Amino acid sequence: MIYREVLPDKTLATSINCFWMIQASEAEALRDRTFPDGCQEIIFNVDTDVLRNDGHGYFSNPAVELVGQMTRPYDIVTRGRQTFFGIKFYPHSFSLFTDYSIHELRDQSIDVRDLLPDGFQAVVEQVLARRDFSYFVHSMTRYFQQLVSAIDITSRTYHLVDQSVRRIFLDKTSSIESLARHLNVSERYLQAAFKLHVGLSPKQLWKMIRFQRAFQYLDNPATPLADLALACNYYDQAHFTHSFKSLAGISPGEYRATAAPLNQHFLNKTSHAYLCNYRTGV
């Protein structure tokens, strides 16, 4: 299975984290679990059926889907050629491109053609016909460049959220009180701004970012969980295990023993598609 990433050009660097691709050499069926990562993404499931378990059974995801902010893990089954093209946004940046409530899109997989302005459908048809990752990156870049050129990203609320996300990524804050104080706004205003642009509270995003940091240590079975907890700024191992399980649905030990045929590509510490907190250029 091949995994590739392409970073956006400078015109999109503050709104798109990266473009990514997964492609297998032959058709197969896979099972995996997806975890909350604080970001939204568009995924083209090319010649691949994706079923997601929402707790009431498995349901088919759209061929071209927006994966809204996740607040819990989801088990998935994929069948077919295992070809996926993706666009990973920052926690707040997809809000620039749609009039829909980001908060209302949480924990949903939605046909993204229903969310974006006219013109996207034609681009989708061309991408699905070509089935070429380079063409996908080129087409999506042109489309979102056109959207960005017509968007006002200077609003006070968006700028405030952008500053907040940067500080959370850089681990410069650990509470909404300190974050609001640094930005000279009320906690209520900051909470409302996050709900509008991120779909999560600052506390939820901070929890997810810290959760992500654990994976670079979990890949090494020789790292004791107590040491991992301290490295990721948890109070102790018990606190880490409880927090991890609330977002992963399994314990750290169970995760180490579980196969992740798709997630393994995103959880690598060099990946931009999942571990976006390691980038400081947001």
Segments the model singles out, each with a brief description of its role:
Residues 205-208, 234, 238:
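Conserved structured core elements
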Residues 196, 220-227:
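Extended, basic/helix-rich recognition subdomains
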Residues 179-180, 190, 214:
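A general nucleic-acid interaction/assembly signal
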Residues 154-156, 167, 194, 198-218, ...:
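Alpha-helical DNA-contacting segments of helix-turn-helix folds
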Residues 1-162, 166-177, 183-187, 201, ...:
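Alpha-helical bundle regulatory/interaction domains
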